[in-house]
Amino acid sequence: VTVLTRLVDLRDLQPSQLYISEAKLDRIERKFDTSHPQGVPPVPIVRLDGRWMLTDGHTRAFALYRSGAREVRVIDEPDALDWAAYRVCVDWCLDEGIEWVGDLAGRMLPPREFEQLWLLRCRRMQEELARLRGEG
């Protein structure tokens, strides 16, 4: 199966994540050549409310940004995800002034803090959405 990728300016992608895991960033920067978009696997994006949004790959995109790259290879998000949850995450980002991956600079956290401040927050939000939908 051939997956079509294209290059997109990092400034044109809305993050859906408030923080970057320092540990994951370190692994990515050691594993891939982050000096150019072809050195990193493509990141999935989707058009949500008129804007291109990262659904995953925030750390890869941020690693490219840190190395001075201006673009990232993207693929269209292949899965049907919980778009209500992503809208909540994007709203959190906008409330914190995060409108592109460069805005995540200074928001890198060690693993324990990343778990507490981001992953647990997302889990609670997903549980609340499930409760509101009558799923929980």
Stretch-by-stretch model annotation:
Residues R51-G136:
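Basic- and aromatic-enriched surface patches that contact anionic nucleotides/nucleic acids
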Residues V1-T55, T59, Y65:
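Short alpha-helix boundary/capping and kink motifs at helix termini
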